[in-house]
Amino acid sequence: MTMYALNLFNVKDGEEYAEYARRAEEPVRKYGGKVIAMGKLDSYPEGDIAPRQVLMLVEWQSKKGIYQYVNDPELEDLHPHRELGVDDFVWHLFEKIEDLRPVLK
């Protein structure tokens, strides 16, 4: 089942995050992920969460692939680069739906 990982964050250390992004590209692909959108905050006219500087939307082939990526022991030294590179990290997982019927029940 296709999943979307919504990542919202502020960049704290550009070098650390750049290292994470560079090294994460191949493993993300290996586990069925693909960055499908990135954005830089333009404005925040409405909402309950504090605005974040960066949006990254990753499409995954499955929830299992997400957790394989996150828990791969060979990537143990990779994730700290993300943690050191960002602040105020929000990570939400969404199941793909074709229309709103599943949430309007």
Role assignments for model-derived ranges:
Residues 87-91:
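A short, amphipathic edge element
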Residues 1-73, 92-105:
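Short S/T/G/P-rich N-terminal loop/turn motif that feeds into the first structured element of a domain
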Residues 29-30, 74-80, 86:
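A common structural junction motif
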Residues 4, 84-85:
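Intrinsic disorder/low-complexity signature
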